[in-house]
Amino acid sequence: MRLSRFFMPILKENPKEAEIVSHRLMLRTGMIRQQSAGIYTWLPLGKRVLDKVNAVIREEQNRSGAIELLMPTLQSAELWQESGRYDAYGKEMLRIKDRQDRPMLYGPTNEEMITDIFRSYVKSYRNLPLNLYHIQLKFRDEIRPRFGTMRSREFLMKDAYSFDLDRAGAEHAYKRMFAAYLRTFDRLGLRAIPMRADTGPIGGNLSHEFIILADTGESEVFCHKDFLGFDIPGEDTNFDDVASMNAIFEKWTSRYAATSEMHEEAAFDAIPEGERLSARGIEVGHIFYFGTKYSEAMGAKVLGPDGKEHTVHMGSYGIGPTRLVPAIIEASHDDNGIIWPKGIAPFDIVVINMKTGDDACDTACGRLYSDLGKAGFDVLLDDTDERAGGKFATADIIGVPVQVIVGPRSIANGEVEVKDRKTGARETMTVEAAINKLVAAR
Amino acid sequence: MRLSRFFMPILKENPKEAEIVSHRLMLRTGMIRQQSAGIYTWLPLGKRVLDKVNAVIREEQNRSGAIELLMPTLQSAELWQESGRYDAYGKEMLRIKDRQDRPMLYGPTNEEMITDIFRSYVKSYRNLPLNLYHIQLKFRDEIRPRFGTMRSREFLMKDAYSFDLDRAGAEHAYKRMFAAYLRTFDRLGLRAIPMRADTGPIGGNLSHEFIILADTGESEVFCHKDFLGFDIPGEDTNFDDVASMNAIFEKWTSRYAATSEMHEEAAFDAIPEGERLSARGIEVGHIFYFGTKYSEAMGAKVLGPDGKEHTVHMGSYGIGPTRLVPAIIEASHDDNGIIWPKGIAPFDIVVINMKTGDDACDTACGRLYSDLGKAGFDVLLDDTDERAGGKFATADIIGVPVQVIVGPRSIANGEVEVKDRKTGARETMTVEAAINKLVAAR
């Protein structure tokens, strides 16, 4: 993408309304724009990051055996009356009447709808296990939306729903998703710690929140330091294998970790003092096993191998992509701006033309842009008329991992500078060497 | 994808509520499920097609120079009061009040919001031309939703919005999108004819509907037969070049074509009788140039090269992906089911194991599945326990372009059958020859 043809409205000033660094940087870099309280547009730069985060989530959901569909945003009130949550959900549910005066709602979550889909098609244990997910907008009418897309009203959620014949099957499903979440957050550059958590309005028997540590987190969390070093399940993980799933789950639940709602002072105090971690955290995922809560109320049953009807056991598993993006920024930035982890950055490489209009600079930039693009990189070429200082500041604040700087003096020797955004390390080399180095490091 | 692990609930019976073939086939094959009147879930098979259609739309939008963002579904009523459309829009607009009693609405389109975004960031002609698009859910509270996702209430729309300094610039933007639409529909296997059209509630001076001919179409259309043979702009089309855009536009508007609202009997009668086409059509795209209608009302101005303020000229450009999917089916099916054009099919190839559990069949299927997958194909392997006849019917109805049939008798000679879904042509060859043939034809 040539910056002269892109739409990336960088703000010169820090927006006053931003209380936390991710919100400030997302507004400054033109990633998002608030349309109404808690309702945001994802501008082109932000949309690129959001797409890449979604792609990672999707890959790991698919790897674990979950299947993607797409449920609508609007739901009929009837479904929620069946489960009993229509009245229970309170003011966070956005209730709507259509032109025929039928009561509807903007889905805050989809347990009811997916259970309705399940019961209408699946009649036999032979079709189990089943895990269906979608990445779809939700609306929760928060009384105090804040921190940009960290706590917004209209937000994107990946929500998966598992169906199993019995509790043992459902626990395997839960552990599959547990392992998939560990992989997902790791690929997003985050160390997320699964913590025992309250089940809230979803309900159920077993629940973990995945929390990343950050000073701006809304939750107070307590855990063992060992979590910082635990291994992440590899790409070759066999999610079908019960023993593997058990081993991962046991490892990652072998140490104390709890949010304040579930905190047990005595258990935490039993940890040697130097190994305790008491910090603030951001919830980036939440998984639930709730047995037959919805399947019972809504009649989701299958014939078992014994020829009898069984009410299915369910779980649900959420990740909020529109919250993950600011969470990643909270975890990865410096005074100059965002530092995107590889694979999530809006562009892989930014080529900075220090003197647009200079023949040698333009030619070298054109070659870098074209060759790196052909090699499969997402390249941003800063071909605008801005002065070099402004271009450097822009490249830093938007956090593209690698900068290739093309200036008139060095290009006279056929050389460019390659800068690593994270470490600040710079290296001077020929255009060809730069291309070869970047392609080799892919 | 192994069918035994996929979720594809094929219905045995034709659903009674379906009046047109696409609706019937989408329900039969488990592509969609109705949740409420005019509100659908896209089940996994349908979601795969929808994703591929969106990918084609996105590629062609990007190629033409448009930039993707993502606006929210809910909008504040205030914005629409500014443009004057809040009262004008009528009952199709879903009006909502949030917990603070603020009037909001589920966006039926985004002219107001994009104009608001534009005016808050763009102040100079130097940032023009600009075309911003998103692919986002819309809601229109149709009095009579019908034909499945062909006319639903919650639907997906790709809507692009162009901003230019003057009318000449806006006409170039209009013609860019005109050419992009020709390419898009062609890649989706459709012959879409641009027809002069009424501008409806969007308003404006110039408008074309892109119509495909189909007996089940809701519009009556009239055009010259020459449209069926016109060339589609190539991949190397230079969208920046005004002369190229003019040439394409002139060619494709050189013959009579109008919907019934804009029909002129006399002009149509002037066409020699054998060259007239009077038929029913499905609208698959609609483009508008409406000058300063919204920019004037909402104060979207830029400084021109003359140092003076200019109210920008705008256009908007819509395609409905959730309507395109059934439109493609209307245009491409036979008595046995859907016939997907290449590139849009939910899977590229289906490997049918006629006797799951038979060692030779299982081994050959495993190899085909693995090798074709590695070659980059989306492969569905029917490894279920169903009888062969049922598997053939399923492969036909879901419309995957190529079937590779592995049966115990032919595999004893090391052979499989390759069937073309569209022509019905079958060829027997070795497993290796089948793989080579399919990879070579990619």
UniProtKB/Swiss-Prot annotation, chains A, B:
Its main location: cytoplasm. SUPFAM superfamilies: Class II aaRS ABD-related, Class II aaRS and biotin synthetases. It comes from the Bacteria. It catalyses: tRNA(Pro) + L-proline + ATP = L-prolyl-tRNA(Pro) + AMP + diphosphate. One of its GO terms (molecular function) is ATP binding. Pfam families: HGTP_anticodon (PF03129), tRNA-synt_2b (PF00587). Gene3D superfamilies: Anticodon-binding domain, Bira Bifunctional Protein, Domain 2. It is found in: Cytoplasm. Its EC number is 6.1.1.15. The keyword Plastid does not apply. GO terms for cellular component: cytosol. One of its GO terms (biological process) is prolyl-tRNA aminoacylation. CDD domains: ProRS_anticodon_short (cd00861), ProRS_core_prok (cd00779). Keywords: Aminoacyl-tRNA synthetase, ATP-binding, Cytoplasm, Ligase, Nucleotide-binding, Protein biosynthesis. InterPro entries: aa-tRNA-synt_IIb, aa-tRNA-synth_II, aa-tRNA-synth_II/BPL/LPL, Anticodon-bd, Anticodon-bd_dom_sf, Pro-tRNA-ligase_IIa, Pro-tRNA-synth_IIa_bac-type, Pro-tRNA_synthetase. It is an enzyme of class 6 (ligase). Catalyzes the attachment of proline to tRNA(Pro) in a two-step reaction: proline is first activated by ATP to form Pro-AMP and then transferred to the acceptor end of tRNA(Pro). Homodimer. Belongs to the class-II aminoacyl-tRNA synthetase family. ProS type 2 subfamily. This is Proline--tRNA ligase. It comes from Sinorhizobium medicae (strain WSM419). The gene is proS.
